Every structure is written in structure tokens, then in C-alpha cells.
Design a protein with these regions (language model features):
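N-terminal leader/linker segments that initiate helical-solenoid repeat arrays
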Residues: 15-64, 68
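Canonical positions in the second alpha-helix
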Residues: 47-48, 81-82, 125-126, 164-165, ...
């Protein structure tokens, strides 16, 4: 009997050690992902997937990592594996839809049609599986408000979804309504809905800072301050509040020292991730801050830094043209 107990103890220890090792692989991949080291994340997660091929969360994080590197085919493959592992997981379907959508955005028109249809199908499935998967509802609504009927879109499909979402969460509902109007370039109504969203106790930092991105493009400093205040209450560790507050101060031409400090802090800590303003944007706004103070050399340095990080940064491109003429 003692030898049997010993064998069972060894077996239990082996299983526990294996589980710890597998969990460690996923967590190591997550840490690399959070640090924006997507190459390392992929390498770590691939090893974890080999050890535990039925772990859908590993495949999901692999898909997200591939998407950050704009590697659409492997992202789709990983997301498809996640769905195959757990077909009832709403989040897996949502991210498979996102992967299809990203590839559609970079595909030729013929391939894009098929991919767009797949995108909507996955978003719809995600919502059917979990009515309170708000991010899935938001992307489904955005798809229907922006995509043509040829691929399954149509605002008439979005309106019932917006109504259902508003009944569950007022902030999410107002955001969805505003985002739909943004797709239609009806900015007056979008403004109203986004204001209501921020007043309705939003719980999602992604929702809040998406409104921040809109406010930057519309040059709305007061809304940006509200975004920063609300975002910092919901997610104090999220660095995006610094960026949007800094931009607001530049637009208002107030407290230049504070604006510089906020934008510099953000540029040093911002993750390179979808949904976050790139560090290049912070340098471009620093350039504008210095340009308005007639500090031409400092402004030029910041705009050049922005272009080194992102050669397509329009704000920095236009500023350099101005400065060369002056």
C-alpha cells in the first residue's frame, strides 16, 4: 500500500508541476505582450501551445500578438484554433472576427468581401453566445453602421442592437449611438451621444479613450479633459490619461510646463498597442507646443523624433513643411 501511495503522490506532483509550468508559459507570454514585446510573446506562447495544445487562452493571446505585428494570417489561424478548442467562448469568436476584419482592411476588394462577411458572422456569434460581451456588441454595431449591405452591413441592423445595449448599460448605448453617427460623419449627433456616454458612469477604459481619440481629431479640449478625468478614475494605472490631458492643455494654450511633462511621461511609458496613441503622437504634440512658443529648434527636434518613430505622421510632416518655409 505504501508503494501505491508513493506512486500516487509522484503522479499528483507531476501533474501539478506540469500545470504550473503551463500556467507560467501563458503568464510569461502575457508579460511580454503587456511590455509590447510581441516577438517574445509569440515565441513564448508557441512553446506554451506545444505543451498544452488545448489551451484556448494561449491561442487567443497568440492571435492578439500577431495582430499587433500586422501578421494577419497567423492571427487568423490562432484565433480559429481558439474557437475550435472552445466553440462556446464569446471572446474567441470576437477576436476571430477582429482578425478577419484586419485582413479584410488590407486585402483586395474580392477577398475583402468574403473576409468582411466572415467578420460579421463571428461578431454576431460572439454576441449570441454572450449578450453582455459589450466589446463584441460595439464592433458588431460599428460594422453594421459602416459596412455596405453587400457584405451584410446596414444601419437598420445596428439600431436594434444599440437599443438592446442601452438597456443593459447606458454609457455603452450612448457610445454605440455616437460611434454609429461618427461613421456617417454626423458629428453634431456624435458629440451629443459621446457627451452622454461620459456622463453615464462608463466602466470601460477603451470606450472612454476611444472618445478621446475622437476629441483629438475634432480639436475638443474640454471633452479631452473630461476624458482624462473619467479615464483616470476608471483605470488609474492607464497612461492614456496623461496623453489626452496634455493634448487638451496644448489646445487650450494653458500650463505649457504641465503639458510638456504629461506628454513626455506618456511617450516614455506608452505601450505600442492598438487603442493607444503612439509615442510619435506625443512627440508631435510636444512639437506643436514648442512651435506655439516660438521655440523653433525644440519644435523641430520633436517633430523629427515623431517622424523617426512614424514617418507617416501627418501632423509632424505638415509642421516640418511650415518650419522649413519660415
Amino acid at each position: 500500500m505504501k508503494w501505491l501511495l508513493a506512486v500516487l503522490c509522484v503522479a499528483n506532483w507531476t501533474v501539478a508541476a506540469t500545470n504550473v509550468k503551463q500556467e507560467a508559459g501563458l503568464e510569461a507570454g502575457r508579460r511580454a505582450y503587456e511590455a509590447s514585446d510581441y516577438v517574445k510573446a509569440i515565441q513564448t506562447l508557441q512553446a506554451a501551445a506545444a505543451q498544452e495544445p488545448q489551451n484556448g487562452d494561449v491561442q487567443l493571446l497568440l492571435a492578439k500578438s500577431y495582430l499587433e505585428l500586422q501578421q494577419h494570417d497567423p492571427a487568423i489561424k490562432s484565433a480559429e484554433k481558439a474557437v475550435a478548442i472552445d466553440p462556446q467562448n464569446s471572446v474567441y469568436h470576437e477576436w476571430l472576427g477582429r482578425a478577419y476584419g484586419e485582413k479584410a482592411d488590407h486585402a483586395g476588394w474580392f477577398s475583402a468581401i468574403s473576409l468582411a462577411k466572415k467578420t460579421r458572422k463571428e461578431f454576431e456569434t460572439a454576441v449570441q453566445l454572450d449578450a453582455r460581451n459589450y466589446s463584441a456588441r460595439q464592433v458588431l454595431i460599428e460594422f453594421d453602421c459602416s459596412a455596405p449591405g453587400l457584405v451584410g452591413g446596414g444601419e437598420e441592423k445596428a439600431l436594434p442592437q444599440i437599443k438592446q445595449l442601452a438597456a443593459m448599460d447606458a454609457a455603452e448605448g450612448h457610445f454605440a449611438a455616437g460611434n454609429c453617427r461618427r461613421q456617417k460623419k454626423d458629428f453634431a449627433v456624435a458629440d451629443e451621444e459621446f457627451t452622454k456616454a461620459l456622463e453615464s458612469n462608463p466602466k470601460s477604459a477603451e470606450l472612454i479613450y476611444d472618445i478621446g481619440d475622437y476629441a483629438v481629431k475634432r480639436s475638443q479640449p474640454e471633452r479631452l479633459l473630461t476624458v482624462a478625468d473619467t479615464g483616470e478614475q476608471v483605470a488609474p494605472a492607464d497612461s492614456r490619461g496623461k496623453f489626452y490631458r496634455g493634448v487638451a492643455l496644448v489646445l487650450k494654450k494653458e500650463n505649457p510646463g504641465e503639458a510638456e511633462g504629461l506628454l513626455r511621461a506618456y511617450s516614455k511609458t506608452a505601450p505600442m498597442r492598438t487603442g493607444y496613441p503612439r509615442p510619435a503622437a506625443a512627440h508631435a504634440w510636444l512639437g506643436r507646443l514648442f512651435e506655439e512658443q516660438n521655440k523653433t529648434e525644440e519644435a523641430t527636434n520633436e517633430f523629427e523624433s515623431a517622424l523617426r518613430l512614424d514617418p507617416k505622421n501627418k501632423m509632424a510632416q505638415e509642421a516640418m513643411k511650415r518650419l522649413k518655409k519660415s
